[in-house]
């Protein structure tokens, strides 16, 4: 039997029972780093906090899908391209790999999915256009 999990709802400003949309399944989306430089303490803090949630859900027998994105196109990355002469791919691959090494050192569980912003630009543009049209 599963223990009832209670999570803080930051919108409602109160603790509420965790009620998954699908029984025994939990999907978590975490905004990951913008990969233009080495990881910092803020990246570690976020990773550790969501790793704790991941582990608690698994310990309570949930099938967990943990998704963390990489922002691999951004003004800071473009600035780094201009400063170094490296390609977008060279810079982002270097810092994604460095981030993953740091997370392994911290013993963070692996994510189920790690989408990159550059692979989802079309759907982002469509979403933005939908939001603009609702204005």
Regions found by a protein language model. Name each.
Residues 2-135:
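N-terminal Rossmann-like or analogous alpha/beta NTP/dinucleotide-binding catalytic cores
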């Amino acid at each position: 039997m599963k223990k009832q999990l209670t999570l803080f709802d930051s919108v409602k400003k109160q603790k509420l029972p965790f009620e998954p949309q699908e029984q025994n399944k939990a999907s978590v989306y975490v905004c990951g780093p913008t990969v233009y430089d080495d990881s910092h303490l803020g990246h570690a803090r976020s990773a550790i906090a969501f790793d704790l949630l991941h582990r608690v859900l698994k310990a309570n027998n949930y099938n967990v899908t943990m998704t963390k994105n990489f922002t691999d196109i951004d003004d800071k990355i473009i600035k780094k391209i201009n400063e170094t002469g490296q390609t977008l791919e060279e810079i982002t691959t270097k810092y994604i790999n460095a981030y993953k090494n740091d997370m392994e050192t911290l013993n963070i569980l692996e994510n189920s999915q790690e989408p990159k912003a550059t692979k989802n630009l079309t759907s982002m543009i469509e979403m933005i256009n939908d939001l603009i049209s609702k204005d």
